[in-house]
């Protein structure tokens, strides 16, 4: 009896843990890809990248000074980036959220084709094919989205596709507070 009871107890314990983690993931409360960032509460790292759509222009962190905004790191090679794109369009057009994109490790022609096909949610897009800027932000995958407040401080980070649940819980309160104070 003991020979089967111990393995059964271990199996049931692991099954329960697995079920709990799945429930947390489905509710958006646990993201196994989420890695803490050292930038929360610190000044946003400065970058200067050529604009994807107009390479003669430079996109800088300082372009957004005085505003609450999102920085979204994306690439056409990233399935989750395609998944979140429609929601980014919603945020930019319906919620009037300023979003700066960094197109990372990508082919400019493919990125432009994606935007032409699906729409462009970005106020500006820095082109970073060699990781010149994203390394300073601690980016290790895409998509990653950062919220920067009006003082230029990084307040939130999300790894993975942005969706309504993440928007409501992590990012929207900052935009609501900024709208209330203006």
Model-derived segments and their meaning:
Residues 4, 116-121, 128-182:
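Thiol/disulfide oxidoreductase modules built on the thioredoxin-like
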Residues 72-78, 104:
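Aromatic-flanked redox-active Cys/Sec active sites in thiol-based oxidoreductases
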Residues 47-70:
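A short beta-strand-turn-helix
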Residues 70-71, 99:
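Hydrophobic beta-strand anchors of alpha/beta hydrolase catalytic cores
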Residues 28-31, 50-56, 125-128:
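Short gly/ser/thr-rich secondary-structure transition/capping motifs
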Residues 45, 69, 142-144:
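Short loop/turn microsegments at loop-to-beta-strand junctions
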Residues 1-50, 182:
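N-terminal targeting signals for export/organelle localization
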Residues 82-119, 128-135:
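Structural microenvironment flanking redox-active thiols in thiol-disulfide oxidoreductases
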């Amino acid at each position: 009896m003991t020979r089967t009871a111990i393995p059964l107890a271990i199996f049931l314990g692991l099954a329960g843990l697995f079920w709990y983690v799945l429930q947390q993931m489905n509710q958006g409360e646990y993201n196994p890809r989420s890695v803490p960032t050292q930038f929360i509460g610190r000044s946003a790292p400065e970058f200067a990248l050529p604009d994807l759509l107009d390479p003669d222009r430079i996109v800088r962190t300082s372009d957004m000074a005085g505003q609450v905004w999102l920085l979204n790191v994306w690439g056409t090679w990233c399935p989750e980036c395609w998944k979140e794109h429609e929601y980014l369009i919603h945020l930019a057009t319906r919620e009037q959220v300023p979003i700066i994109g960094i197109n990372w490790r990508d082919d400019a022609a493919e990125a432009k084709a994606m935007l032409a096909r699906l729409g462009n949610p970005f106020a500006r897009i820095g082109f970073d094919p060699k990781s010149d800027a994203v390394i300073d932000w601690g980016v290790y995958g895409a998509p990653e989205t950062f919220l920067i407040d009006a003082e230029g401080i990084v307040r939130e980070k999300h790894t993975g596709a942005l969706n309504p649940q993440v928007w409501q819980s992590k990012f929207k309160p900052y935009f609501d507070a900024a709208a209330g104070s203006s």
